[in-house]
Design a protein with these regions (language model features):
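Conserved N-terminal segment of class I S-adenosyl-L-methionine
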Residues: 2-155, 176, 192, 199-278
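Short catalytic micro-motifs in class I SAM-dependent methyltransferases
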Residues: 164-168
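A short glycine-rich, Lys/Arg-flanked "PGG" loop and its adjoining helix->strand segment in the class I
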Residues: 174-185
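Conserved beta-strand signature within the Rossmann-like core of class I S-adenosyl-L-methionine
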Residues: 186-194
Length: 279
């Protein structure tokens, strides 16, 4: 049996449930420590299949999947994975250059990015939007006093963040609009998506957004701007036009069977073709 104290920070370990401790012990024994990124994806897929999840039905099976301890493993994994930390630092550096007074990380999970940002911008108000944050995440964030967990967005923000969120939800256009409504005009939304079949919980009915996301955001009124690692910054220009974004999304879905025939690495061409066909 693996000694969790050698792999899990004490502040986190004392907040884990018996089920979480048992699962982590099993995983660490199976992989002789932390699994690789690909093995974490494998573990997620195992649970998706074990719960019998259907990507077309967001029901209690999917809810149970997202409550499984594999997501605690994912949060801990990111805290020590070099590539993930590189992304986090790059996001933080970009955010710090924007100097927002108030920002929120929507679906910020374990709060790692928010803690980085809170330390880089000690005078900023940093919120992690999660209706049911894990006690361990709250405990770890306590050392960064300007970071707090909130159940929902409220009021107006200078900057919003959503990383690896929209590929998991059935209506990403609607959720993007709902959240962007809290962004001040001229504010920026840092979004990083993966509309690709990396893991089973990336909904396949959304894969057309790999090429159609930027055109849809532009139609909505969120102008695509600077690329930041695997994400992009979108600036709010004014009122949000959700029907226009949905039209682009629907057109992108129809174009997708042809777009996906492009060679790998041709995302820019796919986006350009989608924008041309769906303008």
């Amino acid at each position: 049996m693996t000694d969790l104290a050698t792999l899990v920070p004490p502040l986190v370990l004392e907040q884990l449930t018996t089920e979480e401790q048992a699962y982590l012990s099993q995983v660490f024994s199976r992989f002789n420590g932390y699994p690789s990124l690909e093995e974490v994806w494998q573990l997620m897929d195992e649970q998706w299949l074990a719960f019998g999840c259907d990507p077309e039905r967001m029901d209690e099976r999917v809810t149970a999947f997202y409550r499984h301890p594999v997501w605690m493993l994912n949060g801990l994994f990111i805290e020590q994975h070099a590539q993930s930390l590189k992304h986090r630092q790059a996001f933080t550096d970009w955010i710090a250059r924007q100097r927002p007074a108030r920002l929120a990380d929507f679906g910020g999970g374990f709060g790692g990015l928010a803690r980085f940002v809170g330390q880089a911008l000690p005078d900023a108000q940093v919120e992690v939007v999660d209706p049911h944050p894990h006690p361990a995440a709250i405990a770890v964030a306590a050392s960064t006093p300007n970071v707090r967990f909130v159940p929902e967005l409220s009021g107006e923000y200078d900057l919003l963040i959503a990383t690896d969120v929209f590929e998991h939800v059935p209506d990403p256009i609607g959720l993007a609009a709902e959240t962007a409504a809290h962004l001040r005009v001229g504010g920026q939304y840092l979004i990083a998506n993966c509309f690709q079949p990396v893991i089973l919980c990336h909904l396949p009915q959304l894969f057309h957004f790999h090429a159609a996301w930027d055109p849809a955001m532009r139609a909505m009124g969120l102008a695509p701007g600077e690329a930041v690692q695997y994400g992009r910054a979108y600036r709010r220009r004014g009122e949000l036009d959700v029907p226009a974004a949905r039209r682009i999304g629907d057109c992108g879905r129809k174009c997708y069977p042809w777009i996906q025939r492009l060679p790998k690495g041709r995302t820019r061409i796919g986006r350009a073709l989608t924008a041309w066909f769906c303008h």
